[in-house]
């Protein structure tokens, strides 16, 4: 009796093995019994929501980004030509009356001109001998000079007056984000442009998204491409900065593409300043897996911007056939965009091999059970 039980043990083990093989690999989550909120477009046809384009040399050429060319900026030139600094509260002015040193406070060895100058009060005035308070806020230096000269003429014959700014403290622009030295920059009598501000901030960091710099002026945002400005000389991207302007250089976290499928290293890749081509993306993923990939099925899935895309389409899909290695020439010229998904499909033989690998334990278990049953029957 004991021997019979011992011989039944392999059969029981086989049955256990088979029952284990009925569990498919991977986790599962059933929606049965759960409150499923059905959407209005739940019955969508995904095939009708995408456009598929086989890559050809002509299509690659059509998709190539048009290079920015050098452009002048006549409006900026006019702004700079007519630019005049207007005094604000906190500025320090130096007033010199020639041949009347008693009206001029000289800067000594241990005192700078900003220490000895005339500070503009919060109410917009400054004090000057003989004439008392002088309203200076919002005025140019020539307007202030003319006002002081006219009022001093009551006390001094033909006064020769000179006015300059010893310290610019009232007006600032702010540079933040991915620059080497963020902070505030003074608005002075020298016009400050976007390019000047970036250079004064020590340039961009490696994490900067120089294509989507944001300038906030009077509560409104403008997008500026420093790539077009600095790399291609497109001066139309340059702007004159005014008091209170904020120049923000964002991180390039959104400049990424995804490489998935039958590659040696599925990856999320970040674009650098020069962008990324399809060949570079595949190379950074250590290439396609030659044993499992379908070289004719390399796809770039490009989401269409905006709700529903164009005409209800959500993505354009570009297919590259790399069965012929010379097609890599097209891949080298095909430039990726942020959030592109590069997907390499599986070869049919690889799918078959994976199916066989999943079935082998079951087949072996059935065979083992059959052999065991035969042994028991003969016993």
UniProtKB/Swiss-Prot annotation:
InterPro entries: Poly_export, Poly_export_N, SLBB_dom, Wza_C
Lipid-modified residues, S-diacylglycerol cysteine kind: 21
One Pfam short name: Wza_C
PROSITE patterns documented for this protein: PROKAR_LIPOPROTEIN
Main subcellular localisation: membrane
Homology family: Belongs to the BexD/CtrA/VexA family.
Protein's recorded name: Putative polysaccharide export protein wza
Taxonomic source organism: Salmonella typhimurium (strain LT2 / SGSC1412 / ATCC 700720)
Lineage: Bacteria, Pseudomonadati, Pseudomonadota, Gammaproteobacteria, Enterobacterales
Gene that this sequence comes from: wza
